[in-house]
C-alpha cells in the first residue's frame, strides 16, 4: 500500500491518533482473524464440492488473513512509538499488505463480473465457469497483485522520526514526481477502476432483472448493497487522501508541509487502519447473508451458503437430464426460470 506505517505518528499531539490506531487494529484482529480462519476452515473442511465462487471466497479470506497476520507487528510498533523490526520487515510487511489489498480488490471485481456475465450471457458463463478457468483466473489475480504492489519494495525505508529519537517505517521517494506517480497509480489501479467495474456490474444486473421482471430475494439485494457499501466505506476515504496528496506532490509540495499537508498526514494514519478493518468485515457480511442458515446449520452455515453454488452444479444437472432423456427416463422438472435467475444474481452463489 502507498502508505506511511501505522506506527509513523510519533510526535507530541498525536497520542490520540495512536490510541485510535491501537483500538481499530485490535478490533480488526479480534474479529477478522477468527472470522476469516472460520471461513477458510468451513470451505476446506465442510464443503465437499467447491464451486468457483467458493474458491474465490476462499482466496478472499486468505488475502484478508495475510493482512491481519501483519497487524500484531504494527500494533507493537504503535504501542512502542518506534519501528523495531528492521528494514527487511518494514518492506516485507507493507508488501504483504499491498499484495493483499490488490488481491482483495481484484477478487471482488472478478466476482461481480462473474455475476454480471451469468445474468447477461448465462450459456457463455456456463462454458467459462469451470474449475480449470477459475484456477487460471486466480493465479492471474495473484500474479497481478504481486506485480502491482512492487513499488512498496522500492520506496519503503526506515529512518528517524520527527523527534529524532524513534524509527519510522516510511515511504521515501527520489522526487515529488515519483510520489505523485505512485499515489495516482495506486488510486487508479487499487480503487477507481475496480470500483467502477463493481458498480457497473451490479447496475447491469439490476437493470436486466428489472427489464425481465424477475423476482429478487431480499437476501441477495441486501448482500449486494452491503458488499458495495463496505468496499466504498473502507477504501474511498483512504484513496481520497491519496488523491489529494498526489495533486500536492504534482505541485511540488513536500509530504506533511503546511497545515493542509499535516492534516492529510494525520488522516492517513487513521485511514490506514480502516484497511485492516476491511479485512475483518467479510465474514460478518456472510453471516448477514446466511440469515436462517446461521440458525439452522450452526457452524456449517458458510458451507451451506456456498453449497452447490455456481453454474457447475446446474451444468451437471442439465447433463444428467439430457442423459435421462436419451435413455428414455423421465427427467425431473426444471426449476422456475425466475427462481434460477434470481439465485444466479447472488454474489455468493
Swiss-Prot record:
In which broad location class does this protein mainly occur, judging by the first location in its UniProt entry? membrane
Quick check: keyword Membrane in the entry?
yes
- Residues in the Extracellular compartment per record: 1-19, 76-91, 160-179, 244-269
Q: Which residues cross the membrane?
A: 20-42, 55-75, 92-113, 139-159, 180-200, 223-243, 270-290
What about PTM? Phosphorylated by GRK6 upon leukotriene B4 binding; which promotes desensitization.
Q: Name one Pfam family in it.
A: 7tm_1
What's a single GO MF annotation on this record? leukotriene B4 receptor activity
Please give the residues the UniProt entry marks as glycosylated.
2, 164
| UniProt keyword annotation of Glycoprotein present | yes
Q: How does it sit in the membrane?
A: Multi-pass membrane protein
UniProtKB keywords: Cell membrane, G-protein coupled receptor, Glycoprotein, Membrane, Phosphoprotein, Receptor, Transducer, Transmembrane, Transmembrane helix
Spell out the subcellular localization from the entry.
Cell membrane
What functional role does this protein have?
A: Receptor for extracellular ATP > UTP and ADP. The activity of this receptor is mediated by G proteins which activate a phosphatidylinositol-calcium second messenger system. May be the cardiac P2Y receptor involved in the regulation of cardiac muscle contraction through modulation of L-type calcium currents. Is a receptor for leukotriene B4, a potent chemoattractant involved in inflammation and immune response.
InterPro entries reported for this sequence: Formyl_rcpt-rel (IPR000826), GPCR_Rhodpsn (IPR000276), GPCR_Rhodpsn_7TM (IPR017452), Leukotriene_B4_rcpt (IPR003981), Leukotriene_B4_typ-1_rcpt (IPR003983)
Q: Which ranges of this chain reside in the Cytoplasmic compartment per its record?
A: 43-54, 114-138, 201-222, 291-349
Q: Where is this region: Disordered?
A: 311-349
- The protein in question is named Leukotriene B4 receptor 1
A GO biological-process term: neuropeptide signaling pathway
Question: Organism's domain of life?
Answer: Eukaryota
Amino acid at each position: 500500500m502507498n502508505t506511511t506505517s501505522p506506527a509513523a505518528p510519533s510526535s507530541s499531539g498525536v497520542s490520540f491518533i495512536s490510541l485510535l490506531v491501537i483500538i481499530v487494529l485490535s478490533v480488526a484482529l479480534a474479529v477478522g482473524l477468527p472470522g476469516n480462519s472460520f471461513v477458510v476452515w468451513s470451505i476446506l473442511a465442510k464443503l465437499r464440492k467447491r464451486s468457483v465462487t467458493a474458491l474465490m471466497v476462499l482466496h478472499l479470506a486468505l488475502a484478508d488473513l495475510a493482512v491481519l497476520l501483519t497487524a500484531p507487528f504494527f500494533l507493537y510498533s504503535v504501542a512502542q512509538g518506534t519501528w523495531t523490526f528492521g528494514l527487511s520487515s518494514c518492506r516485507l510487511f507493507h508488501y504483504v499488505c499491498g499484495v493483499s489489498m490488490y488481491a482483495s480488490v481484484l477478487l471482488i471485481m472478478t466476482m461481480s463480473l462473474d455475476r454480471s456475465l451469468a445474468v447477461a450471457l448465462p450459456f457463455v458463463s456456463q462454458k467459462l465457469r469451470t474449475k480449470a478457468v477459475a484456477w487460471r483466473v486466480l493465479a492471474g489475480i495473484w500474479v497481478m497483485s504481486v506485480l502491482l504492489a512492487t513499488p512498496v519494495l522500492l520506496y519503503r525505508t526506515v529512518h528517524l522520526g520527527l523527534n529524532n529519537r524513534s524509527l519510522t517505517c516510511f515511504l521515501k521517494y527520489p522526487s515529488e514526481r515519483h510520489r505523485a506517480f505512485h499515489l495516482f497509480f495506486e488510486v487508479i489501479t487499487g480503487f477507481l477502476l475496480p470500483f467502477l467495474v463493481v458498480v457497473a456490474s451490479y447496475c447491469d444486473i439490476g437493470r436486466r432483472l428489472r427489464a425481465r421482471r424477475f423476482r429478487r430475494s431480499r437476501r441477495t439485494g441486501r448482500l449486494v448493497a452491503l458488499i458495495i457499501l463496505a468496499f466504498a466505506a473502507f477504501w474511498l476515504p483512504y484513496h481520497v487522501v491519496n488523491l489529494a496528496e498526489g495533486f500536492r506532490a504534482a505541485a511540488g509540495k513536500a509530504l506533511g508541509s503546511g497545515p493542509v499537508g499535516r492534516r492529510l498526514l494525520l488522516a492517513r494514519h487513521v485511514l490506514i487502519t480502516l484497511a485492516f478493518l476491511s479485512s475483518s468485515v467479510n465474514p460478518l457480511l456472510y453471516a448477514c447473508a446466511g440469515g436462517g442458515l446461521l440458525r439452522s446449520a450452526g457452524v456449517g452455515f458458510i458451507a451451506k451458503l456456498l453449497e452447490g453454488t455456481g453454474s457447475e452444479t446446474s451444468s451437471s444437472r442439465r447433463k444428467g437430464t439430457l442423459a435421462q432423456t436419451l435413455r428414455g427416463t423421465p427427467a425431473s422438472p426444471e426449476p422456475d426460470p425466475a427462481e434460477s435467475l434470481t439465485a444466479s444474481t447472488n454474489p455468493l452463489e
